Amino acid sequence: MHQRSVHYWGDIDTHGFAMLDQLRAYLPQAQSLMMDEGTLMHHSDHWGHEAQAQQRDLPRLTAHEHAVYDTLRDNRLRAGLRLEQERIGFGWVKQSLAALQK
């Protein structure tokens, strides 16, 4: 598994990023998928609420992932913001998966 590409697609919330950070403790090559600012902003009509946000530092996130995590953790857009992965549009998912093949 350590020689394989690994993609992680979780909810865009503080817990989703915490799980990504934990995964990278075992599989440091894991790449996030559809957990970026563009995905979050494109699906603003489907935002939900995260009742209890993670507050700890996540040292295994990339700079781009950390920017989104900090936005969520610090309530920069709104308090408790989250986007559940199942709320992301199918067309967006299909396009993102197709981009992996290139």
Regions found by a protein language model. Give the residues of each.
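Catalytic core segments in nucleotide and nucleic-acid processing enzymes
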Residues: M1-L97
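Acidic two-metal-ion nuclease catalytic site recognized across multiple nuclease folds
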Residues: K102
